[in-house]
Regions:
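Short aromatic/hydrophobic "clamp" motif used to bind/position activated sugar donors
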Residues: 121-123
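N-terminal glycine-rich phosphate-binding loop and ensuing alpha1 helix
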Residues: 23-79
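Hydrophobic packing residues within well-ordered alpha-helices of enzyme cores
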Residues: 38, 62, 82-86, 140, ...
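Conserved N-terminal catalytic core of the sugar/cofactor nucleotidyltransferase
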Residues: 56-119
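Intrinsic disorder/low-complexity segments
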Residues: 12-22
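Extended acidic/charged loop-beta regions that coordinate divalent cations
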Residues: 1-14
């Protein structure tokens, strides 16, 4: 076998390996917040919206999307509730792990990233935001594959007023 043949063999193996790696897209859904601004004993991700907990809508969106699996990050006191009353009850089969969050959002993201080891691409979503769409998810996956990182934003629709502290 000549050098040219050997080079082609190595290159084709790399392409096959890379194609396998690209399949792994993990969604980390953060649901460890306390929702203190809501002035409620129930964190907003667990409040009922329509017939379901707010968190359900985010999990269902990722369940129905091209992501391969979901890591759910929640508070230590809510792990069993999430497992039994949301994931199992509503058959959210892509949830591979439920991990506890940290004191701050970045701690929860860190714990989710540790649990998502092996994922080539990671989407991070706040479980208290139920209006995520399939288009946003697929556009995010497409963008991260091109640019290595991306973020989602929507145009501001409400009036914004600047208030002078002294008035």
């Amino acid at each position: 076998m000549g050098d040219a043949d050997n080079a082609d063999y190595k290159e084709s193996n790399i392409e096959i390996f890379d194609a396998v790696d690209e399949v792994k897209v993990t969604a980390i859904v953060l649901a460890a917040g306390k929702g203190s601004r809501m002035h409620s004993d129930i964190p907003k991700q667990f409040m009922t919206l329509g017939d379901y907990p707010v968190l359900y809508y985010s999990l269902k969106a990722f369940q129905d999307s091209p992501v391969d699996d979901i890591i759910l990050v929640t508070g230590e006191d809510y792990v069993e509730y999430c497992r039994n009353d949301i994931v199992d009850r509503y058959n959210i089969t892509k949830v591979r792990k439920i991990v506890t969050g940290g004191a701050e959002r970045y701690d929860s993201v860190h714990n989710g990233l540790i649990a998502a080891n092996g994922a080539k691409y990671v989407l991070i979503h706040d479980g208290a935001r139920p209006c995520i769409t399939q288009k946003i998810i697929t556009d995010s996956i497409d963008a991260v594959k091109i640019y290595s990182a991306c973020t989602v934003g929507v145009p501001v629709k409400d009036t914004i007023k600047i208030v002078d502290e002294d008035q």
